[in-house]
Amino acid sequence: PDDNLYCTDDGDHTVKKITPEGKLLFQIGVPGNPSEFMSNLPFHRCTHTALCPDNNIFVSDGYGNACVHKYSPDGKLIKTFGEPGSGPGQFNLVHNIVADDDGWIYVADRENHRIQVFNTEGKYEAQWNNLHRPCGLFMPRGKCPVCIIGELGPGMLVNRQYKNLGPRLSIVDNKGELITRLGGEDGPGHRPGQFLAPHGLSADSLGNIYVGEVSYTNWPASFGDDVKPKFLKTLQKLERIIN
């Protein structure tokens, strides 16, 4: 809502607030200096950032921690919530985070195969199930928004060609009820409209969806020792054709 960019760098262990012109406004974290693994201290390979309507900042810290950090608009740590586990408010690779106009926080708890919903104080409220390794999230601004969820496919040799598990996109309402799914019926693929690893999502004012994929990284998990093509798509635009 403040028209700035929040860049979450898991390799550098930082979050940077940047203007559209590229000016650095502030940075959270020390570059190249991660916190201790699973210490719940910021950051150890942070994964994503969400901005609430009150401009408080929420950062998912999921590759080397299992928690979410809440910051003031000027980057001061307010609180941290979450721990490893599979119960309410616990995480197994917290991978993405979004906020809606009412201030609810939606967290992609990837390896627990769910989205967890929290209030702005970090209190657990609900969870959305029947998902498969939810990885990317996008929620447009406005009342009663939908949520677009990018789901990874199976990551094991024994089930990587299973059908109806993804990789895919799921579009749900703000209660987690499924509206539709795109892709994933026949497992991974690299043709237009198929997915290898939906990792980052966005949408424009016309309802077109943009899907960033970590295709090269994911190829061995999806196709094993098959020869990797020289070119794999890493960004797709899905055009909305129905109002």
Language-model features, listed with the residues they occupy:
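Eukaryotic scaffold repeat domains enriched in small/polar residues
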Residues: 1-243
